[in-house]
UniProtKB/Swiss-Prot annotation:
Acetyl-CoA carboxylase is a heterohexamer composed of biotin carboxyl carrier protein (AccB), biotin carboxylase (AccC) and two subunits each of ACCase subunit alpha (AccA) and ACCase subunit beta (AccD). The gene is accA. Residues 37-292 form the CoA carboxyltransferase C-terminal domain. GO terms for molecular function: acetyl-CoA carboxylase activity; ATP binding; carboxyl- or carbamoyltransferase activity. This is Acetyl-coenzyme A carboxylase carboxyl transferase subunit alpha. It is an enzyme of class 2 (transferase). One of its GO terms (biological process) is fatty acid biosynthetic process. Keywords: ATP-binding, Cytoplasm, Fatty acid biosynthesis, Fatty acid metabolism, Lipid biosynthesis, Lipid metabolism, Nucleotide-binding, Transferase. Its EC number is 2.1.3.15. The keyword Nucleotide-binding applies. It is found in: Cytoplasm. Transmembrane segments: none annotated. GO terms for cellular component: acetyl-CoA carboxylase complex.
Amino acid sequence: MEYLDFELPIKELEEQLEKCVIIGKESDVDVTPTCKEINKKLEQTKKDIYKNLTAWQRVQLSRHPNRPYTLDYIKAICGDTFLELHGDRGFKDDKAMVGGLGKINGQSFMIVGQQKGYNTKTRQYRNFGMANPEGYRKALRLMKMAEKFGIPVLTLVDTPGAYPGLEAEERGQGEAIARNIFEMVRLQVPIITIIVGEGASGGALGIGVGDRVYMLENTWYSVISPESCSSILWKSWEYKERAAEALKLTSSDMKKQKLVDDVIPEPLGGAHYDRETTFKTVADYITKGYNELKDLSTADLIAQRMDKYSNMGEYKE
């Protein structure tokens, strides 16, 4: 297990507890009371830390290296029913964007999402979860296929942003994202979107239009990352914590502003602390969202989606 800077008190107590247990096994000394006391202190420390997280700390948790990624959710929720589909039929197969058909609680879905890597080699292979235009065009191809066969769409968002390289711009990055938004608003099947990690800017919006939009508790959704915001406003990344607070990017902020429909609770410590519980909770929210949409006529589905996005935001003097 890797620890973030604010989790170091937890790490110290867990190490103390581990040593206490080892001493108990290797000697005749009764360390049960000591172990219980350390464990009690550990549980209280976890509550004190995780119940009072700052916006920046939630950003850090969303990027935790042990956090489950899109394919982890797909494997856990769909099992062996998932069939991955590849390519945009125009340029190439973008490894930062994955998608395919799978069943969740017996219902077929077309699933699309950004995928990050687990180590240096796979992070480069997945381009750090930053999709190129062909990734967004692949996503749109799969969503249009789902529309053709009447299959609902599930999108899993986890990206630090769309790839900003020159070659991506030359191949039409902005157009690809804009086209996806345009088409998703009009897609004739239910769309459920879940932000499972980072939800940065147009990179997230390119697969982020949904009839139901959920955020996991320790994720963020914003037009810009705190570091980039800090570098623009204060010419330094040192103010990233201040930027995170100002951006109102946490799941609770997004729900208060009615930019997402609900927040999916995570186990204490984050999704990676209890993956099985996280996967089950996410699957339940997917089924719940789909059940709320499945009986709507196509006209009502699209009208409600249009209204949802037309009514977002408010103007204040």
